[in-house]
Design a protein with these regions (language model features):
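Membrane-proximal intracellular helices of multi-pass ion channels
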Residues: 1-493
Length: 493
């Protein structure tokens, strides 16, 4: 394994994180908050560590899938570890387990929180929490690819390891330009939302924090009631933007290239929008509140469905109080998730649809054994390798999810709380049901359960395999063997 290349890229991740910490520092300056000193200190340490790790560029630029997985997993852990330090230095989240949980929740765009009252946090800390969603939404490594020429051959491996969905491809021939296009679209949509939020009456600080949380489909808020205190106009606007950020960004690229027919022909988007409309109407009928207008009921239903399926996690109502049927729909949506190639989490609509079509094809084979039935998606035959990858992903994800539920169950909470809390963290949704519901948080769980769910958030955001690779013994045995061979070949040995 090429450890020097991994070290080099991890160093650049710290350099980028140091640069990004300028925003909470600037926020502290604007609001004259002493907490900004902690962010400035950590920013300096990040920059120093990054400079040391990138001082010498690796001579051997070879970089393969295993390095991509390891670098991605270590990068997210390292970024979260440095990012959580200001929480402890300011005393706002003094426990390392809690601070790490909060920061991982931010970067993985989960939005699950252990903070009892977010309104008591400093402006700079709330800005950093919300900004972490925006950073993690598209991915720190995709940002790195957009702005820096990395070691040879590493670009596609890093993008595959970090990008959500069953496959990742290039929008243009060079991966670096693909990353740039993705970020230009991401920034453009974010700026558009900020402008709409300002138009709806938000302050610039509120608009920026809310837009960061929406764009990254994260869900950290700056008020205890999340989005409930804002006007109906803003709630509808946020609903639309949540849905928009849950769409595959290839669709926006096609629109930018003036190919609207190709963009609107996206099968995954059709399923995604259809699921949203169907789920919202069913919840509206099931949880209809006669004390509210039809518009109010529709607004709450569409908002919560959009929030859960895109794994954003904002709330305008306490859906803990909804009937059991509505709870069931929300839990299913947690697993379905948004589109591949979006900033959303979950299993992804494309995987669910391909899996559903595979079951139908398998059943059809029993009726007509001699007929070759191929699974089609986006007007193309799904190849065997993609089918195998999806099956392996489902098996690994469900197995890890089950283990996590059993471990968190040791806390003694009811099954609804335990199951939904793990589902909310594994699928990067944020709020669950019961004790982990939208009006509560995850502070009541033990440190052990918080560590388990912190791992779940990383597993879910990186789609299992990069994190699993860190615990795969043959990888490290092979790396140790390669190191011994290099040492034996050294003229100084």
């Amino acid at each position: 394994m090429n450890t020097k290349s991994i070290r080099f890229i991890l160093g650049w991740i710290l350099n980028i994180e140091a640069l990004l910490m300028l925003l909470p520092v600037a926020t502290a300056v604007v609001y004259r908050e002493e907490e900004g000193i902690a962010y400035a200190l950590v920013m300096a340490v990040c920059a120093a560590a990054g400079a040391l790790m990138t001082y010498k560029k690796p001579n051997n630029p070879s970089f393969y899938a295993k390095e991509g997985f390891v670098c991605t997993a270590l990068g997210w852990i390292l970024m979260s570890a440095f990012g959580c330090v200001p929480f402890m230095l300011t005393g706002e989240i003094p426990s390392f387990v809690d601070a790490m949980f909060e920061m991982v929740s931010g970067f993985t765009t989960t939005g699950a929180s252990v903070v009892l009252n977010v309104e008591e946090l400093s402006h700079c800390t709330n800005m950093w929490r919300c900004f972490s969603h925006w950073i993690g939404g598209m991915g720190i490594l995709v940002f790195l690819l957009a702005v820096l020429p990395l070691v040879g051959g590493s670009n596609m491996q890093l993008m595959k390891a970090e990008s959500p969905g069953p496959s990742v491809g290039k929008l243009v021939p060079k991966v670096r330009f693909t990353a740039r296009i993705l970020y230009v679209l991401y920034v453009a949509l974010t700026v558009l939302q900020v402008l709409v939020m300002l138009l709806g009456g938000m302050t610039f600080y509120e608009a920026l924090c809310t837009s960061f949380g929406t764009a990254g489909t994260g869900g950290f808020g700056i008020y205890g009631d999340s989005i409930a205190g804002f006007s109906p106009f803003l709630q509808w606007a946020i609903t639309i933007f949540m849905i928009a950020f849950g769409v595959n960004f290839n669709v926006y690229f096609l629109l930018y290239m003036r190919r609207p027919k190709d963009a609107l022909h996206c099968e995954e988007m059709h399923w995604y929008l259809g699921i949203i409309v169907a789920a919202a109407l069913m919840i509206c009928a099931n949880a209809y509140d006669v004390a509210m207008t039809l518009e109010g009921n529709l607004r709450q239903s569409f908002f919560q469905v959009a929030s859960i399926i895109t794994t954003t996690g904002f709330a305008t109502t306490d859906f803990n109080l909804w009937p059991g049927f509505s709870h069931g729909i929300l839990v299913v949506l947690m697993f379905v998730g948004a589109c591949a190639g979006s900033t959303g989490g979950g299993f992804k609509v494309s995987r669910i649809v391909i899996g559903f079509k595979s079951v139908l094809a398998y059943l059809g084979a029993f009726l007509h054994p001699r007929v070759v039935r191929k699974v089609k998606f986006e007007d193309k035959d799904v190849d065997g390798e993609t089918m195998r990858a999806i099956s392996v992903y489902f098996t690994a994800a469900i197995s890890l999810f089950t283990i996590s539920v059993l471990l968190v169950a040791l806390d003694g909470f009811d099954l609804v709380t335990t199951f939904s809390a793990v589902a909310a963290t594994f699928n990067n949704v944020g709020p669950g049901l019961g004790v982990a519901g939208p009006t509560s948080n995850f502070a009541a769980f033990s440190d052990f359960s918080k560590v388990v769910m912190t791992m779940d958030m990383l597993l879910g955001r990186l789609e299992v395999f990069p994190m699993l690779m860190l615990f795969y013994p043959p990888l490290w045995k092979e790396s140790i063997g390669e190191a011994r061979i290099r040492r034996n070949r050294s003229p100084f040995h």
